[in-house]
Amino acid sequence: MNSAESGAEPADPILADGRRADRIEAMSRPERARAPAELQPETSPGHGIAADLIAVLVAVTGGEPRVLTLQDARALPSGPFELAHRSLQSGLRAWVERQTHHPLGYVEQLYTFADRDRGLGSDQRVISISYLGLTREQPAAGDYEASWQSWYLYFPWEDQRLGVPAIIDDVLLPNLTAFAEAAPNRLLRQERLNRIAVTFGLDGKPWNEELVLQRYELLYEAGLIPEARRAKPELGPAPVPSRSMVLDHRRILATGIARLRAKIKYHPVVFELLPDTFTLLQLQRCVEALAGRLVHKQNFRRLVEQQQLVEETGQMSQDTRGRPAKLFRFRREILTERAIVGTKLPISRS
């Protein structure tokens, strides 16, 4: 399986009302219309190409990162790009809101998946354009049985908040080691062992929470997850216990998680997931949920203060489970900045 990095470059964030994306697209239409005949795309006889729009819609609820799903929690909201859609992102919004009754707010493009053999049949090539959306969870509704699920249901090895999950030592590493030992030559064996060490933080290498897609693709290549065995039923059940998804939707979800884990380190998108007012502990727990790692409390608060990301509201939380804490809000002027240069969240293993 090729990495998602082989797809299109990520696009800039899209405005909630879609104006900027539509304006850019409208400006490009006359240029396409005037293109010489020899530059117009050709279609191959007997073969079709279609565009599919897929949403990775994320919320953080009760300290858990959750993703909006369909079809008994085995699919992401998606639908074909149709002629009636005035732009890609307007088509995405139409499908998500039709299928889930959940409005979209912050949206940015992830990648374009166009690999062959994506499980979509050989008579048509489907280009899937994926988007990452951040929201606050609302009760799911609709005709497609939409539901919110923890993304650790699909990637249980990614949650390191309480230490290294047992599934890594008990299931993943023994099977991955066997995969490496089965290599036909010494060079490939060593290459596989190196990949395992880098992706899972072995042999003195640190755990990198951003390598979500690389870990998933390694498990796929080793044939350890259900998606890798669909065309080979004779292999029996996959040895790694985790929830699979239709087609390559779990690969797309892995791409979205990796993007968000990287983005929270340099851009204040985490505030899209929080209520209007929050405590610093709520902010910290939200970051930890997304990263799958704990952060150092004092360093985290010092960083937030240094970056001037929040301001006090003058009110206290009404949570009766402990001592009242100060309520903060996100400084809205930060929204006009493209990035917080140099911001790195202090993530620790403890």
Residue ranges of each PLM-predicted region?
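Conserved Nudix-box catalytic region and its N-terminal flanking loop in Nudix hydrolases
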Residues: 63-104, 110-116, 264-288
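Long, intrinsically disordered, low-complexity Ser/Thr/Pro-rich regulatory/activation regions
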Residues: 133, 308-350
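Active-site-adjacent beta-strand/loop module that shapes the phosphate/pyrophosphate-binding cleft
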Residues: 117-142, 257, 326-334
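Intrinsically disordered, low-complexity segments enriched in serine/proline and basic residues
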Residues: 3-11
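N-terminal strand-loop-strand
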Residues: 36-75
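Charge-enriched amphipathic alpha-helical scaffolds
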Residues: 294-313
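NUDIX/MutT-family hydrolases
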Residues: 130-134, 141-264, 277-281, 300, ...
